[in-house]
Amino acid sequence: MHDMRNTARLVGVCSLVGGAAWTAACFVHNSLPQGCIDAECDGHAMRGSSPVATTLFVVAGLMLAGAGVGLLLLARERNGGLGRAAVAAGVCGALGLLLLGSAAVVSAVDNDWNGMPGLVVPGVLLLAAGLVLLAVAVIRARVVPVWCSALLLASALVLPFANEQTSRILLAVPFGVCWALLGVVVLRRPAAVQREAHAGAGTM
């Protein structure tokens, strides 16, 4: 019981910090000169990154990864085990974060590397797929209110349309806001999350 409450609180803190860092990173990144997409890059420099934006995105990635793992643990307690959606969410999310992390490292070394889309595009798609599956697993387990999971799901579906080269990076802002909101919800009701998880496990 005590461990589940601690897990819920950890999820809340990671979600809130990660969501806030992600949102701030999007605005900081958008303050940089506009980049280019595909054919527009002929004679036009791609948008790089800044140390502040990169640091914020790294913090956000680590915090949200921790929050995602915590949510899966709560869902496992709720359902008495991890379903296929939860396992697939973990795999897709991990691969997506690995690719995006690699892109961040490469960007710090060479902002104009032509192969960047090969890391960013599949990374974003895998991350979005993992988040959709995570939202499905959380909705099924009712770890948090359904409306909160639904907002996270909707923001994940918008994520692939964001692009770090233009102001379309702001399409990723709702994703960070929804994670921060989820963190607030969990922190305000960690005991309730714990009770729901154990109640669900008891009915399996």
Can you annotate each of these PLM segments?
Residues 2-204:
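Hydrophobic, aromatic-enriched alpha-helical segments typical of multi-pass transmembrane helices
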